């Protein structure tokens, strides 16, 4: 018995014994390990040989017949064994658990504790009949409201990420045509089983993974699975050892574009290629974003410090002689003062604002935290088709008259490089226009040709558009050359031909035109047209053809050959019955007209975007399902492989030595295909990524895309992945940020992604990177501003407990600071423009460049925070002194001050104060401390505009939102001070004008002090001063 079997049996025995917690623990561990094993097995390439074995072996393997299909009774047994042909959704977390998690984070737990203490304190005070305010009750309600509101928002954000499996279900066909017991009928696709004989036709979705048995011109769209934009022929022939590339396998959910086929089902449900992708997509990912990790790190520090200081003050209070309840209230007050209740709201609003800015630039952000993640990105793994390229085949080059010409596909033809009056071009253009089944959708006369919709495959679409631009109206042209018959392209002949009558009614000959694979077309020709004359196709011209063919193929372009033949009018007179099955007409001895190559061209904005990424220290890796030659050519044209960079193969060709003799370290670029990647270990892949800065992966499977992303992450990279197909969804989910295409993207890709590009343009990602970097800088400024207030909020309680003075600042006042006056200035910093060209800096290192570092904390707490505390205490003691309470007299006064029964407490002048008068004076002190803090925070928000540049260089009033926030802050301060009723509700009092002026010198000091700091940082980059003072 194997080790795993023993383990499984052990878990069952434990369950039977009912040994409590151990039973559950072992079973959970077993379940988790099974899930991990299943996920790892899904990452491996599908290991099947159903495409390699003979039809007879296939029948024997699945107990079926290629003529009669399965027996119904046996099919019923198989469905009981394997289950229905559908994708099973993973077990999800209950919604109430998700919501509960949002209410129980690090900060939230602290705030719950503080709220409970407040309620207990209020309850005890009420039961004792003390004449106190309802501050503790208000505080508890406010804290609970903050936790619930932020929790609801967090839950909403999580809820928006819908179940990945749901999007895959849209790809599953509802009905399928099946043959059982020799009878053909339609059944629900989920009732299909392995071994069933099914039929598909143009317009159907393939109902499972099937081995093709018969085919008539069947073509399928594999683009969402493999990334190949061209329709793929499906036929019974075994053409490749890889099941993804052989022609005799059709995959579950792919669309049959044309033709018909029959096949035997070899996989159903979760065992199909699409099922494995769905399982991978739902099983990977869900890792925390860099900004979430940063905030969690910051929250842990804050929570730890809050508990430490709260506990310290609690112990000190107990030692000094305060009651347990009073000491607990101190603990609560310290927690409230130390915890930045408005931080989560500030971060969320800042990220939302950036997301809105990105939306205006065609980037829709699904996960707010992804905004900053994009700014941290150090590697972009980009799909080719539709992202780097335009996802439309376009004529690129032509070869005729022994010259390669670049094609101009613009309507004005101003850049055309060949003579359009040439006889050879006329002959070639005639073949291109006539030997083509594609046609324009009606009613598009006013639309530019490149934007018109064409009914036909990608290659023929490119050719018919080129003909329309160069020749004129193709449909009218075809009408002049009436088509008599045609032979569609098939995988055996590898050519397409059609026979036409000539437009001259006196010329009774037929014209036969043919196009197809260049080498197959050439072997059917005996002559070649050069400058309008037919010349014998000798070795010289064959060599010229081969050179041109290799040159065009080397550019990664798809090349087609064209030829024609005028049939003898005596042998093939008008009305001749052409038989396309028997081919009762010549298919050799034709005249070769030329070559035309096509390519899916790069988007115009991509090379510049790739260059910006390179400048920003971001590595762009191409990961595509397309051919290595095409992938390399596109990579070179957009700058992923830079000019002058060579692969190992390029170096070997240049030095004329075997590839094995080339030192891999000499090759800056590397192109790895799926077959090579399959043979590589994870260590070898990581080593290749380290060794070659410029990488291209071609012919990759969905599992391999996922492995590439994981390998980049092992190197410590923050990885962004772009994609549009179903095959991209596991990699999109696993990446630190997944970016899906909005136009060409599948639902599965969009659901797996964190961001969607509405214009499918790679250049939009660069905009996102820039905005992501900017928001990290601005969040740093916002948090520095937010943290500064912790010291002036904490210091009053420190002096209150240790020096026993009347409380300078109340909890309700602190909450107004946290949740009202400070929110707007901190959010306004999100609108601050960059200090420098942030796209010329390297991506931040998540392990080193923290959102909150030591320099930021020290500067905010112990420099600016201390100055603000001094401002508050100077104003506090000034107010007390002006009312008759000199500083020396105030020290140690707390117990008498708070004694409700003492109605004749004397001040420094001997004046007697009742408890209500003292309470009024205390609320006045709260207000004065609040106002002094507000004045200093105006200076604080101004200095936070920059971290290195002078504020004068950045500009005082360029950030209009910040100016509005400062005005709002001052207006709110005035409203709280002078609005009638505030003393009874929120304990704010009207204060004298001169008390507003006391903190002004401290505000000026903060500004001057920070300008000196920035000057030192700019003057001495890299010095100890820079390291300690630049945050």
From Swiss-Prot:
One of its GO terms (biological process) is sodium ion export across plasma membrane. It is a multi-pass membrane protein. GO terms for cellular component: plasma membrane. Disulfide bonds: none annotated. The active site is at 383 (4-aspartylphosphate intermediate). Residues 116-138, 316-327, 800-809, 874-925, 979-993 are lumenal. Residues 221-236 have a biased composition (Polar residues). Composed of two subunits: alpha (catalytic) and beta. This is Potassium-transporting ATPase alpha chain 1. It comes from Xenopus laevis (African clawed frog). The gene is atp4a.
């Amino acid at each position: 018995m194997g080790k795993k079997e023993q383990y499984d049996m052990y878990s069952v025995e434990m369950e039977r014994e009912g040994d409590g917690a151990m039973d559950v623990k072992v079973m959970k561990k077993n379940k988790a390990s099974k899930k991990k094993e299943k996920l790892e097995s899904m990452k491996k390439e599908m290991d099947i040989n159903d495409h390699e074995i003979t039809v007879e072996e296939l029948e024997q393997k699945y107990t079926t017949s290629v003529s009669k299909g399965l027996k119904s009774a046996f099919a019923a047994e198989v469905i009981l064994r394997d289950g229905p042909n559908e994708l099973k959704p993973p077990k999800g977390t209950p919604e109430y658990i998700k919501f509960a998690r949002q209410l129980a984070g690090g900060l939230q737990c602290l705030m719950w504790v503080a709220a409970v203490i407040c309620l207990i304190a209020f309850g005890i005070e009420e039961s004792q009949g003390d004449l106190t305010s309802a501050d503790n009750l208000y505080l508890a309600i406010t804290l609970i409201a903050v936790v619930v509101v932020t929790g609801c928002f967090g839950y909403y954000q999580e809820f928006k990420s819908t179940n990945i499996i749901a999007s895959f279900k849209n790809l599953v066909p509802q009905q399928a045509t099946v043959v059982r017991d020799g009878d053909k009928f339609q059944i629900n696709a989920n009732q299909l089983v392995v071994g069933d004989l099914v039929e598909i036709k143009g317009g159907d979705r393939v109902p499972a993974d099937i081995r093709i048995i018969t085919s008539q011109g069947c073509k399928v769209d594999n683009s969402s699975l493999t990334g190949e934009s061209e329709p793929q022929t499906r036929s019974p022939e075994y053409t490749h050892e890889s099941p993804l590339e052989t022609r005799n396998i059709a995959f579950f959910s792919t669309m049959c574009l044309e033709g018909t086929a029959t096949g035997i089902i070899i996989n159903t449900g979760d065992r199909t290629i699409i099922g494995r992708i769905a399982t991978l997509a739902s099983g990977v990912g869900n890792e925390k974003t860099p900004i979430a990790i940063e905030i969690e790190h910051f929250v842990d520090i804050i929570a730890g410090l809050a508990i430490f200081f709260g506990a310290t003050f609690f112990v000190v209070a107990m030692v000094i002689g305060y009651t347990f309840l009073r000491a607990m209230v101190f603990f609560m007050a310290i927690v409230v003062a130390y915890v930045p209740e408005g931080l989560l709201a500030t971060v969320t609003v800042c990220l939302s604002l950036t997301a809105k800015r990105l939306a205006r630039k065609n980037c829709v952000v699904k996960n707010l935290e992804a905004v900053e993640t994009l700014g941290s990105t150090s590697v972009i793994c980009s799909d080719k088709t539709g992202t780097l390229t335009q996802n439309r085949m376009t004529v690129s080059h032509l070869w005729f008259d022994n010259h390669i010409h670049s094609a101009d596909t613009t309507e004005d033809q101003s850049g055309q490089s060949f003579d359009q009056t040439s006889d050879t071009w006329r002959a070639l253009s005639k073949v291109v226009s006539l030997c083509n089944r594609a046609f324009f959708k009606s009613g598009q006369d006013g639309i530019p040709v490149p934007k018109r919709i064409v009914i036909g495959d990608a290659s023929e679409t490119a050719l018919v558009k080129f003909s329309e631009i160069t020749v004129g109206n193709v449909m009218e042209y075809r009408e002049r050359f009436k088509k008599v018959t045609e032979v569609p392209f098939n995988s055996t002949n590898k050519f397409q031909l059609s026979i036409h009558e000539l437009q001259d009614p006196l010329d009774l000959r037929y014209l036969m035109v043919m196009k197809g694979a260049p080498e197959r077309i050439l072997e059917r020709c005996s002559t070649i047209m050069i400058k309008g004359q037919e010349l014998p196709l000798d070795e010289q011209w064959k060599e010229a053809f081969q050179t041109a063919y290799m040159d065009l193929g080397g550019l990664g372009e798809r090349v087609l050959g064209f030829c024609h033949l005028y049939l003898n009018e005596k042998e093939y007179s008008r009305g001749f019955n052409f038989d396309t099955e028997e081919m009762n007409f010549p298919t050799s001895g034709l005249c070769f007209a030329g070559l035309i190559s096509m390519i899916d061209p790069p988007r115009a904005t991509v090379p510049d975007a790739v260059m910006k990424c390179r400048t920003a220290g971001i590595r762009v890796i191409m990961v595509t399902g397309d051919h290595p030659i095409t992938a390399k050519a596109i990579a070179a044209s957009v700058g992923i492989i830079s000019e002058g960079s060579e692969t190992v193969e390029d170096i070997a060709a240049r030095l004329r030595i075997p590839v094995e003799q080339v030192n891999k370290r000499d090759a800056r670029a590397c192109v790895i295909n799926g077959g090579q990647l399959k043979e590589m270990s994870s260590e070898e892949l990581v080593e290749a990524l380290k060794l070659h800065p410029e990488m291209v992966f071609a012919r990759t499977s969905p599992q391999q895309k996922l492995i590439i992303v994981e390998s980049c992450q092992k190197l410590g990279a923050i990885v962004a992945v772009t994609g549009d197909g179903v095959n991209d969804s596991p990699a999109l989910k696993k990446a630190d940020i997944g970016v899906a295409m909005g136009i060409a993207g599948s639902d599965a890709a969009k659901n797996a992604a964190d961001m969607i590009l509405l214009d499918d343009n790679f250049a939009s990602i660069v905009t996102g990177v820039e905005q992501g970097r900017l928001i990290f800088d601005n969040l740093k400024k916002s948090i520095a501003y937010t943290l500064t207030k912790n010291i002036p909020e904490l210091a009053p309680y420190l002096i209150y407990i240790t020096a026993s003075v009347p409380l300078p600042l109340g909890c309700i006042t602190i909450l107004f600071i946290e949740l009202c006056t400070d929110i707007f200035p901190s959010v306004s910093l999100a609108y601050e423009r960059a200090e420098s060209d942030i796209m010329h800096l390297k991506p931040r290192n998540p392990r080193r460049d923290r959102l909150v570092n030591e320099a930021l904390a020290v500067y905010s707490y112990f420099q600016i925070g201390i100055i603000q505390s001094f401002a508050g205490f100077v104003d506090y003691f000034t107010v007390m002194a002006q009312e008759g309470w000199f500083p020396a007299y105030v020290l140690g006064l707390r117990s008498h001050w708070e004694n409700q029964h003492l109605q004749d407490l004397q001040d420094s002048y001997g004046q007697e104060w009742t408890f209500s008068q003292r309470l009024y004076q205390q609320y006045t002190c709260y207000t004065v401390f609040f106002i002094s803090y507000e004045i200093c925070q105006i200076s604080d928000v101004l200095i936070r505009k920059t971290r290195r540049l002078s504020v004068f260089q950045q500009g005082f009033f360029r950030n209009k939102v910040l100016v509005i926030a400062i005005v709002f802050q001052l207006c709110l301060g005035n409203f709280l001070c002078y609005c009638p009723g505030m003393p009874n509700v929120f304990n704010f009092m009207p204060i004298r004008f001169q008390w507003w002026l006391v903190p002004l010198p401290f505000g000026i000091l903060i500004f001057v002090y920070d300008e000196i700091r920035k000057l030192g940082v700019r003057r001495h980059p890299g010095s100890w001063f820079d390291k300690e003072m630049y945050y």
